[in-house]
Each structure stands twice: as C-alpha cells, then as structure tokens.
C-alpha cells in the first residue's frame, strides 16, 4: 500500500510560535514512517508559508527558550478546491506533490481559532482536529464558558471585558462579584499568554492592560482553589477519555515559562493520584464538555478539583501541545496508547471525518 503524505503545518504568526515548533519536532520524530511520508509546511512569524527540509528545519531544536524555524527558499501558495495539486510553489507556480492529509499543530491565534481550519475546509483537505466552529468556540474563553454553563457544566464565575466596556466595572465591583484572587486572561490566547493572577487593585489594572495587548476581549474569572487536573479526549462521534493527570505547581500559577521554559516550574503526575471514582467522574465530564463544544479528533480538557471533589472546568484545548512535557500524549501513553499509535489514530480520524463531510449533500 502506498504511504500517505502528511502535511505538518507548524509555526505561525502567534505568541505560541516556539511551542508549535517543539510540538512539530516531536510529531515528526514519532510518526510511523512505514505508513506516512512527512511534508513540513512551516509558517514563519510574519505569516508566510514555506516548505521546509525535514532534515534541517529547526535552529536550537533542543532549547525551548531559543528554538527557531530555519529559513526556507520555497514559499508556498494554496489552490482551493478539488485539484490534483492543492499546494504550489509560489516562486515559480509549479505544483508540489499532493498532500493527503494535514496535521495542523499551530498553537494559538490563527492556528487553533478556526482560521486555519476554515482555509483547509475551503481547500477540501482532510485535517487533524476540530472543525471551524468548535475550534473558534474553544479558543474564545468567553464563548466556551457560556456554552458550557448553558449545558449545565460547572465553570468558574467570570465577567467579560471588551475595549468598549472595559471601564464598566470598578475593581470594587469585580471583587464583590468574584472575590480574590482573580485571574485575568485574553479571551483568545493559549499557553497562559497574557494571563495574570491578581490580588489587589494595582495588579488588576496592570493585568487588564496586559491582557488587552493580546486580544480585544478579556475574561476576568474567580480564582478556584483546587488541584489542576487534565484529561485527554480522542475521537469523533464516539470520543474516548484517557486517565487523568495532574499539574503540581512550584510557582504561583501555570504560566507560559512554567509550561515551556522552566524545567522546575511544575511537575506532571500521570496518572493523577485521585480516587478511581473521581477519575471516572472527570473523564465523563471531559467527554460531555468535548461533545458540548462539538470537538473532533482530539482535545485536552483542563479542570480544577476542589477539596470536596467538586469538578470545575477551566478550559478546552483543541490543539494540545506535543512538546516533551505536554500532558496530552503522556495521558494516552498511560492509558495504553503509545505516541506513534496516537499520531496514526489522529490521522485516521481526520480521514474518517473528511469522508463523512464529503458525503453530505451540497445541492437540493
């Protein structure tokens, strides 16, 4: 059987560019090369697409603080529709070999917010992960929280600020509604980019200003005192949940540097040391949240577990990290699904969903 050509899209014009490079490296290293040929489609920080050399595409590959995408001489253009070649060399207009499926691993803005997914749908390319709507909904913390709350799922109390109403609530009003500490977050960022923990008014004003540097909408939420538990979900119509893992912090909260730069910032415990009935409860909630937001392929569901075993959903990440310390592949490894098999299954799910989508009627 001929091998499938998998286009790994990574990098991106995003605050999480370097995280994406780390994830892409691990996927390239782990993918089953007896089944798949890899085509590296790197997006630089200016948003330009390139075809990268699979043998030499990263600088400082083993240094998360300085990892970078190597320049490529081949710029990429895309042709939408059912063409034999969906990708062409932008310099000379010559078609590039057909890509059978896309594995997007562009974290953050323009990568997991539905933008990239919409482009791939227009191009009629199968792709790993959630579709346009669910990607956008999960990326937007305000929208995701409203949908989860309306479905009867437990979330932290919150208020949403926009550039037009950011001064509608005084700090005293915010504190009265949500208490202290607070967390202030850009609505559409991941990896704790622009997130601040707030204990007083001065910190609050600084945190809101910082969050608005990254987004036009900001979520202010009640700080939940509890253990940080994560669960991986895999599947399309009948998703499965992994065992749970725990992030044990050695710092104030799970900030960007704690996640990706500081090796001593947090400890990942897999499986989480929680009673089996609590583990099963979180797994069931994770699947319910996944289905509520219309996810497909994969997502990581992050929750807080309070002292009385109340489960509070924090957020859902539709393109979880695949870095050396990322929880998603570790959770499936602990559940009996190895890294290589996980990647293969994600590609299979992408092809299954693409086939189902193309079977839908488009005419009356």
Swiss-Prot record:
Binds 2 magnesium or manganese ions per subunit. It is an enzyme of class 6 (ligase). GO terms for cellular component: cytosol. Gene3D superfamilies: 3.40.50.20, ATP-grasp fold, A domain, ATP-grasp fold, B domain. GO terms for molecular function: ATP binding; D-alanine-D-alanine ligase activity; metal ion binding. Cell wall formation. PROSITE patterns: ATP_GRASP, DALA_DALA_LIGASE_1, DALA_DALA_LIGASE_2. It catalyses: 2 D-alanine + ATP = D-alanyl-D-alanine + ADP + phosphate + H(+). Its cofactor is Mg(2+); Mn(2+). SUPFAM superfamilies: Glutathione synthetase ATP-binding domain-like (SSF56059), PreATP-grasp domain (SSF52440). Residues 145-348 form the ATP-grasp domain. Its EC number is 6.3.2.4. Mg(2+) 1 binds at residues 302, 315. Pfam families: Dala_Dala_lig_C, Dala_Dala_lig_N. It comes from Salmonella typhimurium (strain LT2 / SGSC1412 / ATCC 700720). Pathway: Cell wall biogenesis; peptidoglycan biosynthesis. Signal peptide: none annotated. GO terms for biological process: cell wall organization; peptidoglycan biosynthetic process; regulation of cell shape. Disulfide bonds: none annotated. Mg(2+) 2 binds at residues 315, 317. This is D-alanine--D-alanine ligase A. InterPro entries: ATP-grasp, ATP_grasp_subdomain_1, D-Ala_lig_Van_CS, D_ala_D_ala, Dala_Dala_lig_C, Dala_Dala_lig_N, PreATP-grasp_dom_sf.
């Amino acid at each position: 059987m001929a091998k499938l050509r998998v286009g790994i899209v990574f990098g991106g014009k995003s605050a999480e560019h370097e995280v994406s490079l780390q994830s892409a490296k691990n996927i390239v290293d782990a993918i089953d090369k007896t089944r798949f040929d890899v085509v590296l489609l790197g997006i630089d920080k200016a948003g330009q697409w390139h075809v990268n050399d699979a043998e030499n595409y990263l600088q400082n590959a083993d240094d998360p603080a300085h990892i970078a995408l190597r320049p490529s001489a081949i710029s990429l253009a895309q042709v939408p529709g059912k063409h034999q070649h969906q990708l062409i060399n932008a310099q000379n207009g010559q078609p590039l070999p057909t890509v059978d499926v896309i594995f997007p691993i562009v974290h953050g803005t323009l990568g997991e917010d539905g933008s990239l997914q919409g482009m791939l749908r227009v191009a009629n390319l199968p792709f790993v992960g959630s579709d346009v709507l669910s990607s956008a909904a999960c990326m937007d913390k305000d929208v995701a929280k409203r949908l989860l709350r309306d479905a009867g799922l437990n979330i932290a109390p919150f208020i949403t600020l926009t550039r037009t109403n950011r001064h509608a609530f005084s700090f005293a009003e915010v504190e009265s509604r949500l208490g202290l500490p607070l967390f202030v977050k850009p609505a559409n960022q991941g990896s704790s980019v622009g997130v601040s923990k707030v204990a007083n008014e001065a910190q609050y004003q600084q945190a809101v200003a910082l969050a608005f540097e990254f987004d036009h909408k900001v979520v202010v939420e009640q700080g939940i005192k509890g253990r940080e538990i994560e669960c991986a979900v895999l599947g399309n119509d009948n998703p499965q949940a992994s065992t749970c893992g725990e992030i044990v912090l050695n710092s104030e909260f799970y900030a960007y540097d704690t996640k990706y730069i500081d090796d001593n910032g947090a400890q990942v415990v897999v499986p989480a040391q929680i009673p089996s009935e609590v583990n099963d409860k979180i797994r069931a909630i994770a699947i319910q949240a996944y289905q509520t937001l219309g996810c497909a392929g994969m997502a990581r569901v992050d929750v807080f577990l309070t002292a009385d075993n109340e489960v509070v959903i924090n957020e859902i990440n539709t393109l979880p990290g695949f870095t050396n310390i990322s929880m998603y592949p570790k959770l499936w490894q602990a559940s009996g699904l190895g890294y290589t098999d996980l990647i293969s299954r994600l590609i299979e799910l992408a092809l299954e969903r693409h086939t189902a989508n193309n079977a839908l009627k488009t005419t009356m």
